[in-house]
Amino acid sequence: MRTFVVALALSALCAAGAPVVAQEGHPLKGSWIGTWAGNTVHGNDLFMVLDWNGKAITGTINPGQDNIVIKSATLNPEGWVLHFEAEGKDKAGAVINYVVDGKIENLAMHNRSVTGTWKSQRGTGAFKITRQ
């Protein structure tokens, strides 16, 4: 009996020291930084905050002065293909509509990325963001 208690105590001690891995939730949820190359209206660098409310992907690009609101977004789990449309304004107040298409890379990693292309009525280019 005493051996059993000692073995049980050692097992509990080992289990307490083991790392705990939690489920992360939606693969797009979180803060992202990256670039949309060649964007002369809003600059090459971008910061995004994305969320999943249980029904839809929501978010903002460059929150603050350059708020670009994501109007619609879809994520196809087959191939992890992302499509979103966003609306911002240039310095004169004219509406700029963005369409971004990309694919999630390194899905299993915390610092996964989305790589693809962006386009608007003012240009097009490469798009890449990495989750922070």
Model regions and ranges:
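Bacterial N-terminal signal peptides
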Residues: 7-16
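Central antiparallel beta-sheet cores of small beta-barrel/beta-sandwich binding domains
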Residues: 22-132
